[in-house]
Amino acid sequence: MAFDISVNASKTINALVYFSTQQNKLVIRNEVNDTHYTVEFDRDKVVDTFISYNRHNDTIEIRGVLPEETNIGCAVNTPVSMTYLYNKYSFKLILAEYIRHRNTISGNIYSALMTLDDLAIKQYGDIDLLFNEKLKVDSDSGLFDFVNFVKDMICCDSRIVVALSSLVSKHWELTNKKYRCMALAEHISDSIPISELSRLRYNLCKYLRGHTESIEDKFDYFEDDDSSTCSAVTDRETDV
């Protein structure tokens, strides 16, 4: 499978390469302005690429050959709809985007996730005090200290982890530490166990359907991508 990407030479290309333990795949994510490219392939595959500069049209050209069984995604300001909630892996991307872009993101799904802030405030009170005084998230070890703080909660209640992660990402974006947001988003979304991911997704669907007044933490749902609670939700109801 061959690919060819051309971008204006004056643009900045942000690339993130990581191994997803949940998907057991190597993931390459590129961002060129508002365009996001995601490539996923098995870790034992070889990817041949060639990057060159075309002086005739002042563009950077990336060409290569990928393994046949490769998932490629490309989105330019793509609206997020409930269809993404049907699949646990796609839902992970939703959480990652929510944590990473908390300051600028909008839409019904993200607005619903923002209601989880109340849980964090109820648990820890003044969030600014928690970040600045207790965790000192702006210090050199701030990212590491925050991850250590929430790691034990990930298997207990992912709702608070998602809330705190999005809030600290929002804080970093305002304090010129935006570079930490991507690392945190990828780590948190990849660290949440499948069971917790399914539970959060299930309860989020119920909330968006109007079946509950808040995103609950019930565990009456087992891993099943064909759950009627999720599949009954239409794009029309949740387009953002």
UniProtKB/Swiss-Prot annotation:
A GO cellular-component term linked to this record: extrinsic component of cytoplasmic side of plasma membrane
Induction: Expressed in the early phase of the viral replicative cycle.
GO biological process: symbiont-mediated suppression of host cytoplasmic pattern recognition receptor signaling pathway via inhibition of IRF3 activity; symbiont-mediated suppression of host NF-kappaB cascade; symbiont-mediated suppression of host toll-like receptor signaling pathway
Record keyword Protein transport present: no
Molecular functions per Gene Ontology: protein sequestering activity
Keyword DNA repair on entry: no
Keywords per UniProt: Early protein, Host-virus interaction, Inhibition of host innate immune response by virus, Inhibition of host IRF3 by virus, Inhibition of host NF-kappa-B by virus, Inhibition of host RLR pathway by virus, Viral immunoevasion
Function statement: BCL2-like protein which disrupts the host immune response by inhibiting the TLR4 signaling pathway leading to NF-kappa-B activation. Acts close to the plasma membrane and targets several host TIR-domain containing adapter proteins including MYD88, TIRAP, TRIF and TICAM2. In turn, blocks the host NF-kappa-B and TRIF-mediated IRF3 activation.
Subunit structure: Tetramer. Interacts with host MYD88, TRF4, TICAM2 and MAL.
Family: Belongs to the orthopoxvirus OPG176 family.
Protein name: Protein OPG176
